[in-house]
Amino acid sequence: MHYNKLLIYTYIEKFDASFITSLPKKISLIYRNYEKTNINEILKIYKLCKKVKRKIFISNNIKLAIKLNADGAYIPSFNNDLNIKYFKFKKNFELIGSAHTYKEIQIKKLQNIDKIFLSPIFENEKKKKNLGIYRFLHLKKYAKREVICLGGIKKQNLKKIKMIEPAGFASISLFR
């Protein structure tokens, strides 16, 4: 497996044109700001992503993602709403979401999530407790969906990610 075959995501909380345009083209953005929803900010991010041909996902707001014609929506682990699966989506609209446990994976399956972000795979500043490689592999097998590694991903553990063969990975610190 080559790195260029992996799906790669990063998160953004506010409009930053230089950050968005400096990322390699392959990296998809997830707009995630739970403190405030600033539609103008989201629109600027969306327009720039479309201009530079970068995928954009809106976190925890499916209606807005559909309205903007975004590439998809990101459903966080704390969102347990099973009515998500009843929305009408365009053909290539993707639902992606995060999970940390078997129970959360089951909920994501019931929500018809296409790709599940399992986290945290490695220790990071926010969470000292992590899944580790073996627990990650167990959860990956149970998910029966494309799985994305998330949490504590740094340059020094990219080889470990390659070994466990996920569909991709997501990181904040790796790209900042």
Report residues per predicted region.
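Hydrophobic faces of well-ordered beta-strands that scaffold small-molecule active sites
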Residues: N4-T10, I27-Y31, I56-I58, A73-I75, ...
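Catalytic phosphate/metal-binding cores of nucleic-acid and nucleotide-processing enzymes, i.e., regions
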Residues: M1
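Structural motif
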Residues: L23-K26, L68, Q111, Y142, ...
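Glycine-rich phosphate-binding active-site loops on the catalytic face of alpha/beta enzymes
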Residues: A73-F87, F117-N130, G152-R176
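Short, acidic/polar
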Residues: T10-L23, N60-K63, H100-I107, K154-K159
